[in-house]
Design a protein with these regions (language model features):
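Cysteine-centered catalytic environments shared across enzyme families
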Residues: 1-199, 203-204
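Short, charged low-complexity linker/loop segments at the C-terminal edge of domains
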Residues: 104-105, 343-345
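Cytosolic regulatory/linker segments at or just downstream of nucleotide-handling modules
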Residues: 348-350
Length: 373
């Protein structure tokens, strides 16, 4: 997707990169706000250009506007803009930006506005929304799930098994000690749905070109190497899309009952009775993760989906009571897997590779992680 003042269409057109699941015939801001998908897009009208990112910036939109020379460029690939000797600015998550083609002034507004009422006492709507989000995104002819021992990929795998799928997952061997998996849980999962294992050899991959696409500090060596290896393997089986649990930090804040387990924890996972105390949520960690995956998959000619930040699912979870949210670590994920008897380790944080109930281990874990990254 590349839209510039030079190739601007003569007719009203909506261009997008990624996936839209509820119709892509978009002609207005109101219709943009109704979109559900993993996408970024540009609506070209006679008098303005309207650009949009989804609520968690599942796809990154880069742009550059020069009001003096009345030029503009929008693209999902930063290299398009770099080749013009321009800097690729990134549009924030959950944002609609309008460029007036008469005045060349820009205005911004939020895409999704969350309903912060916490009224639901069960996870019924959350589970229904999770099933729908995963089902609408899953394409067995193109997709593979990035499998770990954590809660996030576990929920997706559990749902896919309930839908009757097998042989849908892939995982990589060769993790650094600070990112070690809980091997017993992972082995059970791979055995249940016949997951594939690849050996990741970092010597075979160079993430420098990806970093040069756009400086993204979360493209660490191991994660970048893993994604690159999976993309290469996908091509050998005629597939081209990775499905991940990225974004599920939103549901736990890397904390529990007010204890912060990571420096990017906002409120220690202690959800208040009034969500206005913690909203707007700090989503930098989510954006970094999705951004890292997007750059790697884009570079390798593949794609990436994040069903756990589907806006309908997120909204359903927001509407659950604060007591449910505070019932345990990533409690809706826990409850979903427990209901379907899917393997998981209770209170296990894949990102910290340990049991969140053992608070004395976290100082050491955090030190190791900081030293690694």
């Amino acid at each position: 997707m590349l839209v510039t003042d030079k190739n601007y269409p003569s007719e009203e057109t909506f261009f997008y990169y990624g996936y839209i699941y509820n119709g892509d015939k978009v002609t207005s801001v109101e219709e943009i706000k109704a979109i559900n998908g993993d996408y970024c897009g540009v609506l070209c009208k006679d008098d303005c250009v309207i650009a949009v990112t989804d609520p968690f910036r599942s796809k990154i939109l880069y742009y550059n506007i020069d009001p003096e020379y009345r030029t503009f460029v929008f693209s999902h690939d930063p290299r398009d803009i770099q080749h013009m000797d321009l800097y690729p600015y990134t549009l924030e998550e959950n944002t609609i930006v309008t460029l007036d083609l008469h005045t060349f002034k820009i205005t911004k507004q939020p895409n999704m506005i969350w309903d912060l009422e916490q009224r639901d006492q069960t996870y019924t709507k959350v589970f229904d929304a999770a099933n729908a989000a995963i089902k609408m995104r899953w394409n067995p002819d193109k997709d593979k799930l990035m499998m770990t021992s954590g809660y996030d990929s576990g929920v997706i795998a559990c749902c896919l098994m309930n839908m009757g799928y097998s042989k849908f997952s892939v995982t990589g061997l060769g993790t650094p000690p600070s990112m070690a998996e809980h091997q017993e849980t992972l082995a059970k999962r791979l055995a249940m749905h016949k997951g594939h294992i690849i050996k990741v050899n970092g010597n075979n991959y160079d993430i420098t070109p990806i970093i040069e696409m756009r400086n993204n500090h979360n493209v660490n060596e191991y994660y970048g190497h893993l994604l690159m290896a999976v993309c290469d393997w996908l091509k050998t089986i005629n597939k081209d899309c990775i499905v991940t649990g990225n974004g599920a930090f939103f549901y736990d804040d890397k904390g529990l009952h007010g204890r912060q387990f990571a420096h990017y924890s906002h409120f220690g996972g202690a959800y208040p009775k009034d969500l206005n105390l913690i909203f707007p949520r700090q989503t930098l960690r989510i954006i970094q993760m999705s951004g890292a995956a997007n750059l790697v998959t884009l570079y390798k000619g593949c794609d990436h989906k994040q069903p756990l930040v589907d806006p309908v699912l997120v909204q359903a979870w927001i509407n659950t009571s604060h007591k449910l949210k505070n019932s345990g670590y990533k409690h809706w994920n826990y409850a979903y897997m427990k209901e379907h008897d899917y393997p998981f380790k209770e209170n296990f944080s894949n990102g910290l590779a340990d049991d969140v109930s053992r608070i004395e281990t976290f100082a050491e874990k955090l030190k190791i992680i900081k030293e690694y990254g």
